[in-house]
Amino acid sequence: MIIGIGTDIVEIDRINKSIERTPNFINKLFTKKEIEYFISRKMRPEFIAGKFAAKESVAKALGTGFRKFGFRDIEIDKDELGKPLVHLSGGAKETANKFGDYKLHLSISHGRENAIAYAILEVDNNGNCNSSKDEGHR
């Protein structure tokens, strides 16, 4: 059963300007692994904006926004085929654990001007999710 959805759209230029104005912008919002990914992609702003939108959409799907945790408590990764995965820690994980065994689904895309992400938080009707714990959740 779907118990939360979230979507976010970000202007890539807005993210680019934030990076230019705030030297610590990347380090404040992204994990070491995410930053390594950005570096491997030559710090292209569309990838940064996509992960930013993904974190926002996950926070919305959890139903709290960022009131109980920070951006770095949500890490966006990908599997070997490029499918986006979500790894939660800290307050984000505590919030998600209240739902029991859960699964987060995530889609990220971008064009020239915008990046968008859509997240779904799923549990079964008993508050449990039957999927493996290695698929980008918990």
From Swiss-Prot:
Q: Name one GO biological process term.
A: fatty acid biosynthetic process
Question: What reaction(s) does this enzyme catalyze?
Answer: apo-[ACP] + CoA = holo-[ACP] + adenosine 3',5'-bisphosphate + H(+)
Q: Which GO terms describe its cellular component?
A: cytoplasm
Tell me which stretches of the chain form a coiled coil: none
Q: Name one GO molecular function term.
A: magnesium ion binding
> Carries keyword Protein biosynthesis?
no
> What job does the chain carry out?
Transfers the 4'-phosphopantetheine moiety from coenzyme A to a Ser of acyl-carrier-protein.
* Pfam families reported in the protein's UniProt record: ACPS
Main enzyme class: transferase
User: Which cofactor does this sequence's record say it needs?
Assistant: Mg(2+)
Key words of the record: Cytoplasm, Fatty acid biosynthesis, Fatty acid metabolism, Lipid biosynthesis, Lipid metabolism, Magnesium, Metal-binding, Transferase
Q: Where in the cell is it found?
A: Cytoplasm
Keyword hit for Lipid biosynthesis: yes
Q: What is its EC number?
A: 2.7.8.7
- Domain of life here? Bacteria
User: Where does it mainly reside?
Assistant: cytoplasm
Write out the similarity annotation: Belongs to the P-Pant transferase superfamily. AcpS family.
Q: Which NCBIfam families match?
A: acpS, pantethn_trn
Q: Can you name this protein?
A: Holo-[acyl-carrier-protein] synthase
